[in-house]
């Protein structure tokens, strides 16, 4: 799948313009995009990064990393996904960077999602849904999730997000109404962010098939 990820990432470079400040996500597919950014003749002004991992990678290529508070609205955000349905709604957060990813997506005019073909699904939920949670609320949130859904929350032990929080991965969901579930789970006290990108879904999905396919 590495070649599929590379194809999707390199196709996304076509949407990058000189002097842009762009949002950059996190993950294995995004790593290919950052490498492509470092080698393209196009010269961006800088990037807003969704994780410490991506920040380090961008700096390795000499790309300036900027604070979102200082940039305002971004023209473009490029990120991967763990699942994508036919309506460009996503599950994200396998890399535990979902909160910053959702913030940057909201701050961007165009959100391009780059995936390999295996990430396409008819219905979201086979991949466990990540939820970022305030540490003291972990058990409370888990009980609330079980009361409100058919899912089984599992604490991702040993993982602390860049924001100092923990992750619950909710297994065995069949998400027929992603927007509604995203709203409902966001109401639970202690939830920082739900890894459903349904209300703010991707504007464009690049699938790294041969040749790349645009959804």
From Swiss-Prot:
GO terms for molecular function: ribose-5-phosphate isomerase activity. Pfam families: Rib_5-P_isom_A. SUPFAM superfamilies: D-ribose-5-phosphate isomerase (RpiA), lid domain (SSF75445), NagB/RpiA/CoA transferase-like (SSF100950). Substrate binds at residues 26-29, 79-82, 92-95, 119. The keyword Ion transport does not apply. GO terms for cellular component: cytosol. NCBIfam families: PRK00702.1, rpiA. Homodimer. Belongs to the ribose 5-phosphate isomerase family. This is Ribose-5-phosphate isomerase A.
């Amino acid at each position: 799948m590495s070649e599929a990820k590379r194809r999707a990432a390199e196709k996304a470079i076509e949407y990058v313009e000189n002097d842009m400040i762009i949002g950059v996500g996190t993950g294995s597919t995004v790593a290919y995009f950052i490498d492509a950014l470092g080698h393209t003749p196009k010269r961006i002004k800088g990037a807003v990064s969704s994780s410490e991992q991506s920040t380090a990678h961008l700096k390795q290529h000499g790309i300036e990393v900027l604070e979102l508070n200082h940039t305002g609205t971004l023209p473009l955000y490029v990120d991967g996904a763990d699942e994508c349905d036919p309506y460009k709604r996503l599950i994200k957060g396998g890399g535990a960077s979902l909160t910053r990813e959702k913030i940057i997506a909201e701050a961007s005019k165009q959100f391009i999602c780059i995936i390999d073909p295996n990430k396409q699904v008819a219905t979201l939920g086979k991949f466990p849904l990540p939820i970022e949670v305030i540490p003291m609320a972990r058990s409370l949130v888990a009980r609330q999730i079980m009361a409100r859904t058919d899912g089984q929350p599992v604490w991702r032990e040993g993982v602390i997000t860049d924001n100092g929080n923990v992750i619950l991965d909710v297994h065995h969901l069949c998400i027929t109404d992603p927007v509604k579930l995203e709203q409902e789970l966001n109401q639970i006290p202690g939830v920082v962010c739900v890894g459903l990108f349904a209300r703010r879904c991707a504007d464009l999905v690049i699938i790294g098939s041969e040749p790349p396919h645009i959804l």
